Amino acid sequence: MYLSEINTYPIKSTHPISIKAGYLFPTGIGFDRNWMVIDANNAMMTSRKYPKLLHVFSCIEGSNLRVILPQQDFLIPLVPLPNTPVLVKHWGEELMPAWPQNPALDAALSDYLGLPCRLVYSASLQASEVIQTASFADAQPLLLTTTASLAALNGRLNEAIGMDRFRANLVVSNLIADIEDDWKRIRIGACELEVTYPCERCVLTTINPVSLTKHEHQEPLRTLATYRRLEEGGVGFGLNLIVVRAGPIAIGDTVEVLP
């Protein structure tokens, strides 16, 4: 088995950046979900409800993040200067401090999404640790999927889907479907990762990231429910992980299952 994809999502719930190599810090991949879009009530906006976020692109250029909208793009610093923080709602009533970014970008985002919104950066990040924290992650720092499990799912679907439906940070190429259910700990290159729990999948998997349309029969969730039910309810695909031993990773690295 080997690592075949590495993805980071600088702006939560938007298009990923695929990289050939990176560094796994104790809190995940560099620059992963350091930014988030919020609405007029300072609440998190995600592509579950606002699929057009999936067509917001970004790329790292030197010391800046370029945010690319369909009609224009903006440069914002990777290490923003501190300003007056706002309290934003992440999950439920959980409040987190965040820094507003660029009024012109906010206006363009609002126009694109059709409602008032802002891009914010996690104020909990210090400049020295900016690349180390997935501050707006849903659950654990890392999400891993495997190619064999996707192939098995596609074998059950009338229409095949891509791995991008599952928004993984790490994709492992392997031959046996769902074998990752038994993993407790793995090594990728010099890094060691610990499995915390399976990833429960949500309605976002039913949205085509290219056309932004939702599947009329709720696929792949409906098919996953026939054979990937979790004990706690819901359906699972992929694993949530934490970093036990930090270090560099690269596409092609061997993936080893540890006791």
Task: Please give the residue ranges for each predicted region.
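Metal-cofactor-dependent catalytic cores
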Residues: 1-259
